[in-house]
């Protein structure tokens, strides 16, 4: 049968050609003789090799059909060349040492990740629960923010509202992805945190029907509901869901919503415009996401 594809490859031919070149007297090789020795019918394949070797300054043309390996030419064994060769070898050794160090560091990191992910004791410390957060900020209103890297956060100086209370704002701006905000609320040490997204879904602001099961949480300045399961997996991957008071979809207390909506500072704002209103499309560099919408309560 014919020769294999590997035997005809240019890479294998180059290896054989360089071997001939290194064995040639004074490093001078006749290309016609090389083509006959290597049984190459198409001489252009030989020229393809010599063009590359000449381009990287390993050979030079002596005549039309002969080339010379520069490693054996005059001046190739000067002190300058030898010193340069030693420097290059030292650089290679240094790079190989650094590569081994990086490989070792990589193995340590992989083992550390494995210890955290698979060890039963360490596993419970790989996430933060709603209970953990609430215990650190007892009595405060908690907003958990999940935003992509590079998100800009701005907290303007609080302004006094019409009722004499300060109005606080947080402006978040991201150019690389969506920003998700969760309101986490806990009434007392005995109660469990309740969580829902900000702004709340439409069904949270709807009065609950008589057929739905509802639980009225204690009145406070903040109300909350368990985040639906799909939102927990998609929107709050960094926050472990904790069991909370079971509240079916759309069953948050109407009294709590009415109380919040009637207050001077309603903490949850629906930014989607009504069919009759349009968005404000232009933003200056000093404006945040709140300025994109005509939200009067934030513009006092």
From Swiss-Prot:
Motif (DEF box): 36-73
GO MF annotations, alphabetized: DNA-binding transcription activator activity; DNA-binding transcription factor activity; DNA-binding transcription factor activity, RNA polymerase II-specific; protein dimerization activity; RNA polymerase II cis-regulatory region sequence-specific DNA binding; sequence-specific DNA binding
Region (Leucine-zipper): 31-53
Ranges for region Transactivation: 242-300
GO CC annotations on file: cytoplasm; nucleus; RNA polymerase II transcription regulator complex; sarcoplasm
Entry keyword set: Activator, Cilium biogenesis/degradation, DNA-binding, Nucleus, Transcription, Transcription regulation
Region (RBL2 association): 277-294
Protein function: Transcriptional activator that binds to E2F sites, these sites are present in the promoter of many genes whose products are involved in cell proliferation. May mediate growth factor-initiated signal transduction. It is likely involved in the early responses of resting cells to growth factor stimulation. Specifically required for multiciliate cell differentiation: together with MCIDAS and E2F5, binds and activate genes required for centriole biogenesis.
Protein name: Transcription factor E2F5
Source organism per UniProt: Rattus norvegicus
């Amino acid at each position: 049968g014919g020769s294999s594809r590997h035997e005809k490859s240019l890479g294998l031919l180059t290896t054989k050609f360089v071997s001939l070149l290194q064995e040639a007297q004074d490093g001078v090789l006749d290309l016609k003789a090389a083509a006959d020795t290597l049984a190459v019918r198409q001489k252009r394949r030989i020229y393809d090799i010599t063009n590359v070797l000449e381009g990287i300054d390993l050979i030079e043309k002596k005549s039309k059909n002969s080339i010379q390996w520069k490693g054996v030419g005059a001046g190739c064994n000067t002190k300058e060349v030898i010193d340069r060769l030693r420097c290059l070898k030292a650089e290679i050794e240094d790079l190989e040492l650094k590569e081994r160090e990086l490989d070792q560091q990589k193995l340590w990191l992989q083992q550390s990740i494995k210890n955290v992910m698979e060890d039963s004791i360490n596993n419970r410390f790989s996430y933060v629960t709603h209970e953990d957060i609430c215990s650190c900020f007892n009595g405060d209103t908690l907003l958990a923010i999940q935003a992509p890297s590079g998100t800009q956060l701005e907290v303007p100086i609080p302004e006094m509202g019409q009722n004499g209370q300060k109005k606080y704002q947080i402006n978040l701006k991201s150019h690389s992805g969506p920003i998700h905000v969760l309101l986490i609320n806990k009434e007392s040490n005995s109660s469990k945190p309740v969580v829902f997204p900000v702004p709340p879904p439409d069904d949270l602001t709807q009065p609950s029907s008589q057929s739905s099961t509802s639980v009225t949480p204690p009145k406070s300045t903040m109300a909350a509901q368990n985040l639906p399961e799909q939102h927990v997996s998609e929107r709050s991957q960094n926050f472990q869901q904790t069991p909370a008071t079971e509240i079916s979809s759309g069953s948050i207390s109407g009294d709590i919503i009415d109380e919040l909506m009637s207050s001077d500072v309603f903490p949850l704002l629906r930014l989607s415009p009504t069919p009759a209103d349009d968005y404000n499309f232009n933003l200056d560099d000093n404006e945040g996401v709140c300025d994109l919408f005509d939200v009067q309560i934030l513009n006092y």
